[in-house]
Amino acid sequence: MRYYSAPRRALRGVRQLLYPRRCPFCNAVLGSIRTCPDCAEEVDRLRRKPGIRLDASQHYLGGLSGAAAPFRYEGCVRRAILRAKYQAAPWTAVELGVVLAELAFGSEVRMRDAEPVPQRVEGARLGYDCIVPVPASSRRRGYNVPERMAQPLAEALDLPLETKALGPARRKNRQAGLPFEQRLANVAGAFRVQDPDLIEGRRVLLVDDVITTGATAAACAQALLSAGAESVFAVAVATVEFPPIAQPTLPLQEDADEEI
């Protein structure tokens, strides 16, 4: 079922009556307004200009063909992502996915039934065949934030969203607070391709909420490429900008513990 299909539009209409649409950045009620005027200045200030590609001297990209993020992980952008992850706000994740489609891929966003809808761009011509969200724990929140962000992106790029392609291979510690080398070791071997037929020979667009060091995206890319993907490019709503990092020279060792 397409994300913007008629049944889902009807369900959204009911939701709008019970839970009015809110700004993903400040949580103010928006209704049918396209963007929040109160957040416009800060949102623009947090955009990464002029380019959104990540620098390999600042992030570990591993086997990725590249990575991009339109925002710095600060201020209202950081609060929006944390709200989507920890405050039971899946529609915040969807709204951020719409913004990602617009800023990263040039999709024009129009209002339809009081909802922002990204218009189609040719995803295959941009070099992608499918979209794969980074697996994340959904047991407590009931949904996967990168998957929700990827839904409007898949619609805008007219690409299949392969939610069953990639999954956890083992439990791991949380990445937050770990130094760079420990982040790499923590996610090494943490992901596996659950159905190789979904990605074999395909150019994968990997979607995450935040790219910090790049360790998680690189670990996902390693799993996808090992299973036959032709290439993997990562995109996220935001990234943390670091000074140049020293790239690892030793093989990564698996280190299992907690949960994804």
Name these PLM-found stretches.
Residues 1-207, 212-260:
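Glycine-rich phosphate/pyrophosphate-handling loop used in enzymes and phosphotransfer proteins
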